[in-house]
Curated annotation (Swiss-Prot):
It comes from Bifidobacterium longum subsp. infantis (strain ATCC 15697 / DSM 20088 / JCM 1222 / NCTC 11817 / S12). Belongs to the phosphohexose mutase family. HAMAP family: GlmM_B (MF_01554_B). This is Phosphoglucosamine mutase. Mg(2+) binds at S107, D254, D256, D258. The gene is glmM. The modification Phosphoserine is found at S107. Activated by phosphorylation. NCBIfam families: glmM. Binds 1 Mg(2+) ion per subunit. Pfam families: PGM_PMM_I, PGM_PMM_II, PGM_PMM_III, PGM_PMM_IV. GO terms for cellular component: cytosol. One of its GO terms (biological process) is UDP-N-acetylglucosamine biosynthetic process.
Length: 461
């Protein structure tokens, strides 16, 4: 039986794969497994609590109701925070000291999909073992509470949203002694593309409260338009709007706002690697880059690593996935990490990737440095990269096939320190991703094509 939990919770087509019954069962199983993490006495009035948030997908309504029903039937009082970014749920799980945080979202996936993921007390994503434990008791009968032992469900989106926005703004603009709010982004004209998703209220408000002049696009969610030709996966509108309005820069979020990409004044995309480079250098300057190290994944561009090396900043690599980045950060005591896709984890303020936090800190660095985003990003040039997916192959054999490994070694020797190659099996499909980086796009294409041909010949099913 395949695992239900993937790299980012349970996902699938809403009402087909991810049904109300499954959401109910997940809520029921989660309180059994995660409820053991605390005691009744450490919560107000002796009640255990959970918090549920969701993105703007229409299916989020019935899934939130079902998930909350499962948890309240298990004896937990549930706070329904309504539509709120995923990192907002993580933050509130920590600051409100609830035992379980739950998010209903499929992030950057199309609208018909949805997902459920959990945060443990403290706002951290669950380790694999806890997800396995939830899956193991899914749908089982147990001695559920009755009478006064069952939980209540309360709805308070306004309070939850305001607490989160206050936190975000305070990361770059802590209140003055007289309780007035500084405006560090005053005069900064930016465009924010909210993907018609969970940060449609949060990001514009946080940026404005920090002083920015914000032009907002794709912030009118109707339940059906999340990520539709908008946000970080479709930045064309943002690029055009930045140029049309003479904005200094633009920021784009995905549906649940755990990632952020940017656009410079000329409409050029600034990816997660470049954003991480800019923020790592800023933290180093302020003495806040722990161990002078940035945590990245194997997909981060070699150009980033070479540029950081020249600045005296080390990099530590992990597997692809923000959960693996966070694991390494916690293990090594690092303060900043992330992915090329725009997941950036700033442990000074967050326990997970936070797109709105990334946007605020990036805008703040533009102001503090006195440079444009284009100038800042130019210090982190990206090597040309080519990626080819080779389908219908025995992906597990790629690491042991002699001809493939010999070919990889040969290409790496030829590239030296001017490029690299990477073979990565897909986690969900019978395919191998072949990636090459080189000094020129033509050479990257050439290397990638050669290797992809050998992979197809050797591993064909």
């Amino acid at each position: 039986m395949p695992k239900m939990f993937g790299t980012d919770g349970v996902r699938g087509l809403a009402n087909r794969d991810l049904t109300a019954r499954l959401a109910l069962d997940l809520g029921d199983a989660a309180v059994r497994v995660l409820g053991d993490a605390g005691t009744q006495d450490d919560q107000p009035e002796g009640r255990r609590r959970a918090l549920v948030g969701r993105d703007t997908r229409v299916s989020g309504d019935f899934l939130a109701s079902a998930l909350s029903a499962g948890m309240s039937a298990g004896g937990f009082d549930v706070i329904d925070a309504g539509i709120i970014p995923t990192p907002g749920v993580a933050y509130l799980t920590s600051v409100l000291n609830v035992e379980i945080g739950a998010v209903i979202s499929a992030s950057h996936n199309p609208m018909p999909d949805n997902g459920i993921k959990f945060f443990a007390r403290g706002g951290f994503k669950l380790p694999d073992q806890k997800e396995d434990d939830i899956e193991a008791v899914l749908g089982q009968d147990w001695d559920r509470p009755t009478g006064a032992g069952v939980g209540r469900v309360s709805h308070d989106q306004t309070t939850a949203t305001n607490l989160y926005i206050d936190h975000l703004v305070a990361t770059i603009a802590p209140l003055n002694d007289d309780k007035t709010q500084p405006k560090p982004l005053k005069g900064l004209k930016i465009v924010a593309d909210c993907a018609n998703g969970a940060t449609s209220v949060v990001a514009p408000e946080a940026l404005r409260r920090a002083g920015a002049d914000v032009i907002v696009i794709n912030a009118s969610p109707d339940g059906y338009n999340i990520n539709k030709n908008a946000g970080s996966t479709h930045p064309e509108q943002l690029q055009a709007m930045v140029k049309a309005t003479d904005a200094v820069m633009g920021v784009a979020f995905d549906g649940d706002a755990d990632r952020c990409l940017a656009v410079d004044e000329d409409g050029n995309m600034i990816n997660g690697d470049q954003i991480m480079g800019i923020l790592a250098r800023a933290k180093q300057r302020e003495g806040k880059l722990n161990h002078d190290t940035l945590v990245v994944t194997v997909m981060s561009n070699l150009g980033l690593k070479l540029a950081l090396k020249d600045m005296g900043i080390k990099t530590v690599e992990t597997a692809v996935g923000d959960r693996y980045v966070l694991e390494e950060m916690l293990k090594g005591g690092y303060s900043l990490g992330g992915e090329q896709s725009g997941h950036v984890i700033n442990r000074e303020f967050a326990t997970t990737g936070d797109g709105t936090l990334t946007a605020l800190t990036l805008c703040n660095e533009v102001v503090k440095s006195g440079k444009s985003l284009k100038e800042l990003a130019a210090d982190f040039p990206q090597l040309p990269q080519t990626l080819i997916n080779v389908p219908n192959v025995d992906k597990k054999a790629a690491a042991t096939n002699k001809r493939i490994q010999d070919a990889v070694a040969r290409e790496e020797e030829l590239l030296g320190d001017t490029g690299r190659v990477l073979l990565r099996p897909s986690g969900t499909e019978p395919l191998v991703r072949v990636m090459a980086e080189a000094a020129t796009q033509a050479y990257a294409d050439e290397v990638c094509t050669r290797l992809a041909k050998i992979v197809a010949e050797e591993l064909a099913l």
